[in-house]
Regions:
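Carbohydrate-binding surfaces of carbohydrate-active enzymes
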Residues: 1-156, 164-168
């Protein structure tokens, strides 16, 4: 990744800042570069699940997929067992007719990050009112770990902190 070592606190192409703190984009790139991954995309009549194996070994995986509302209710759950050859991909379709304004498709399997069909068009979704609460706050070296819990899907949480910008005198 070029420009990974920017020293200025700005939004750019970098994924790691001057202090070696991972920016938000780091985690998206980490998932994109994973050697085994699940991808799920909404399509006509349901969703298309893609299983990618970029390793030299074949594997068998139980893929769990379906629809979940933003309140956590699930529908149309399915499990499909796939044997995936080395350096290959497989796709399969799941037929689900649910409202994508109130939920999303998901796919998960052991050894994979969970994939979902959520996209960045948040204004198109109807999210329930969040009851997010801070559950625990603990110091870990120079880091402050904050655990937040909610009973419904909460896409955004804003934490007010003291000014942590770097000042050059």
């Amino acid at each position: 990744i070029w420009m990974y070592n920017y020293c200025w606190p700005e939004t750019g192409w970098t994924i790691i800042d001057y202090y070696l703190t991972r920016k938000i984009s780091f985690y998206f790139l980490k998932r994109a570069f994973a050697t085994k991954k699940l991808i799920i995309r909404a399509c006509e009549g349901g969703a298309e699940v893609t299983v990618i194996n970029e390793t030299p070994e074949a594997f068998t995986a139980d893929i769990h997929c379906g629809y979940m509302t933003f309140t956590g209710e699930t529908d149309s759950l399915r499990t499909k067992t796939l044997k995936v050859a080395p350096h290959s991909m497989q796709q399969f379709h799941i037929s689900v007719c649910n409202d994508l304004k109130h939920g999303f498709f998901f796919a998960s399997a052991e050894g994979f990050d969970t994939a979902d069909s959520l996209r960045a068009y948040y204004r198109d979704y109807v999210f329930p009112e969040s009851d997010a609460k801070i559950e625990k706050v603990e110091q870990d070296g120079n880091d402050l770990l904050v655990t937040i819990r909610a009973s419904v899907y909460t896409p955004f949480a804003y934490l007010m902190t003291s000014d942590d910008r770097v000042h050059y005198d």
